[in-house]
């Protein structure tokens, strides 16, 4: 099964997550199909903390990819930010 999940990167005590499309059998930080965004929970003021390629996420969901619970929350958060910025 194809899933959309977070792959951890960054250094010790400085997490950084890539939002990736991957086969569920692969390791969390292992091989992936496509990178569709990132999440930086420790972004400094003025830095971008979240970016999602919504068109690619929609494409993969149409192909049957299942987002993890955390990814669902982040997509919803990013989408609401886009609506506020677009208004």
Swiss-Prot record:
Key words of the record: Ribonucleoprotein, Ribosomal protein
Biological process per Gene Ontology, one example term: translation
Keyword Disulfide bond: no
The keyword Ribonucleoprotein is assigned to this record: yes
MF (Gene Ontology): structural constituent of ribosome
Entry's Gene Ontology cellular component terms: cytoplasm; small ribosomal subunit
InterPro entries cross-referenced by the UniProt entry: Ribosomal_bS16, Ribosomal_bS16_CS, Ribosomal_bS16_dom_sf
Record-linked Gene3D superfamilies: 3.30.1320.10
Coiled-coil intervals, chain numbering: none
Family recorded in the similarity comment: Belongs to the bacterial ribosomal protein bS16 family.
Name of this protein: Small ribosomal subunit protein bS16
Gene for this chain: rpsP
């Amino acid at each position: 099964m194809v899933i959309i999940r977070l792959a951890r990167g960054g250094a010790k005590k400085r997490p950084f997550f890539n939002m990736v499309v991957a086969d569920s059998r692969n390791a969390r930080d292992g091989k992936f199909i496509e990178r569709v965004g990132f999440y930086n929970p420790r972004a400094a003021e003025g830095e971008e903390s979240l970016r999602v390629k919504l068109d690619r996420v929609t494409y993969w969901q149409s192909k049957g990819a299942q987002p993890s619970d955390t990814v669902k929350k982040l997509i919803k958060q990013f989408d609401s930010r886009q609506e506020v910025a677009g208004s």
